[in-house]
Amino acid sequence: GAVVAFVIMRRRAESAAKEIADIFSYTAELLAAGDSMREAIFQCYESLVHVLMGRGFLRRDFETVREFEMAIRAALPNLSDEALSSLDNVFEEARYSRHEMGEVDKNNAQEALTRVVGEIQQIGDIPNR
């Protein structure tokens, strides 16, 4: 019984890491395909919120970007500050900037997403709360 429970818990953690990495990979692909940058990033954000809530890292009525950032930090404790900061910048730029997002913004977003995916793949498991 205990071994089966351990295997199930481990698979859930592995699937969570894969789920989050897949969200970032998919968003990078959308950007590469020329999709609307803001829309792709908002979809990424919404998907992450869904996963983080489902795993118990983010409360349903969260209100601030800081709470979201803390949830990502809790879910991915080994994610580098640089990767988290670049990801925050992408979300903030898409949400709050009024200018047209161009190639430089797209490249920055793709680099941030790719970096986070690479780190998640190195880190491995995400715990359940």
Regions found by a protein language model. Give the residues of each.
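Membrane-proximal, non-transmembrane interaction modules
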Residues: L30, M37-R129
